[in-house]
């Protein structure tokens, strides 16, 4: 039988290993000191439901050299010109940039917008990023803040679709509608007119990872509305993100679909952390939740549209190996039928919730 001292040492060692565990996405590319010469390796590093996203891998590099914006007839060297091309492109930036778009920027499929190596800011009082009926998009290393509503106007959506009138947008940082295979990684998002990320209208195969969400009330919406049941096929991974400071609610808020929320770190929220309606499956695993000081805000979860607790009793909301501080608690419900939600290419190791602050310490844009 092991001695008490040996057991105590092993427990201590396990705690150290857990707290110092590597973030699997960052370990994939940041350990390479020559990543700048091998940028497209990043596309091999996604985990979760968006792990098949290739973005612009295998295509040409396109360098943004100008912060100018023409929504109808963009000039070569601008972000809009590269983002709307039909060809596969890996978009990088020649220098630090502050880009204020005049209309929403429609990002075509098979694109990576890679801000690494430059200090790139989008928003600044203008509208921001929009994806519709596209696949294979990676957004990495961008500061997106101050996104504002847009007006009805003409916009070049893509080379093939051309210029079309588009409705006014709400002022989200990133909007995805009917998008498949998208990966949103290592961005810093804050202070927009509406949400920071919307994933709606049948979008699926999405990973949202290593981002820093702060100074914003309604953070992340997954699912269009309670009548749009096509979102039942939605699958989203939310992993290794830092929520807060000053993040109010919707981290995320889901309608329908399957959402895996793993190894995120939550600062005190204003309303709730994780919520939903229309019977989404929400699997919370290895997160760290620190509740606000107010006693009535301690609950992590919020079920919306339930007349009584029993009305939502069969919703599958489960907490596994989460860590709770300052009185935070997760109200579980339902019974999960299938524990293996990922295939072998999507699966990743999820640490205990006590490790989440370490795993998310580099969330947001990496300097």
Swiss-Prot record:
Cofactor: Ca(2+)
The EC number(s) this enzyme carries: 4.2.2.2
Record pathway: Glycan metabolism; pectin degradation; 2-dehydro-3-deoxy-D-gluconate from pectin: step 2/5
First and last residue of the signal peptide: 1-21
Listed GO MF terms: metal ion binding; pectate lyase activity
One Gene Ontology biological process: pectin catabolic process
KW Ribosomal protein (keyword) present: no
Residues the entry annotates as binding Ca(2+): 170, 194, 198
Cofactor info, note text: Binds 1 Ca(2+) ion.
Active site, renumbered: 250
EC category: lyase
Keywords noted in UniProt: Allergen, Calcium, Disulfide bond, Glycoprotein, Lyase, Metal-binding, Signal
Similarity remark: Belongs to the polysaccharide lyase 1 family. Amb a subfamily.
Protein name, UniProt field: Pectate lyase 1
Protein species of origin: Juniperus virginiana (Eastern redcedar)
């Amino acid at each position: 039988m092991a001695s008490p001292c040996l057991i105590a040492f092993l427990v201590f060692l396990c705690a150290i290993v857990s707290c110092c565990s590597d973030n699997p996405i960052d370990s994939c590319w940041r350990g390479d000191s020559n990543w700048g010469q091998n940028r497209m390796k990043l596309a091999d590093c996604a985990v979760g439901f968006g792990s098949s996203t290739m973005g612009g891998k295998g295509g040409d590099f396109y360098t943004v050299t100008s912060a100018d914006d023409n929504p109808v007839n963009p000039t070569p060297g601008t972000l809009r010109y590269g983002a709307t091309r039909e060809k596969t492109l890996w978009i990088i930036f020649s220098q630090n940039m502050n880009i204020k778009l005049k209309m929403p920027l429609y990002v075509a499929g098979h694109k990576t917008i890679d801000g690494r190596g430059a200090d790139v800011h989008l928003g600044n009082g203008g509208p921001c990023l929009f994806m519709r009926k596209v696949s294979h998009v990676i957004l990495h290393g961008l500061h997106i803040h101050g996104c504002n509503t847009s007006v009805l106007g003409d916009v070049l959506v893509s080379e093939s679709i051309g210029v079309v009138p588009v409705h006014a947008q709400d002022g989200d940082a990133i909007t995805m509608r009917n998008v498949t295979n998208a990966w949103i990684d290592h961005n810093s998002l804050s202070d927009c007119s509406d949400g920071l990320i919307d994933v709606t209208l049948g979008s699926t195969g999405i990973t949202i990872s290593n981002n820093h969400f702060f100074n914003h009330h309604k953070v992340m919406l997954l699912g269009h509305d309670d009548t749009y049941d096509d979102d039942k096929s939605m699958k989203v991974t939310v992993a290794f993100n830092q929520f807060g400071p000053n993040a109010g609610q919707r981290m995320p808020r889901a309608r329908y679909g399957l959402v895996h929320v793993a190894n995120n770190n939550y600062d005190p929220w204003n309303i709730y952390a994780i919520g939903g309606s229309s019977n989404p499956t929400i699997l919370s695993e290895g997160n760290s939740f620190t509740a606000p000081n107010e006693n009535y805000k301690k609950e992590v979860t919020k079920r919306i549209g339930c007349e009584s607790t029993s009305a939502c009793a069969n919703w599958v909301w489960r907490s596994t190996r989460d860590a709770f501080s300052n009185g935070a608690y997760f109200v579980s419900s339902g019974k999960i039928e299938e524990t293996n939600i990922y295939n072998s290419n999507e699966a990743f190791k999820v640490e205990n919730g006590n490790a989440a602050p370490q795993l998310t310490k580099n969330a947001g844009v990496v300097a």
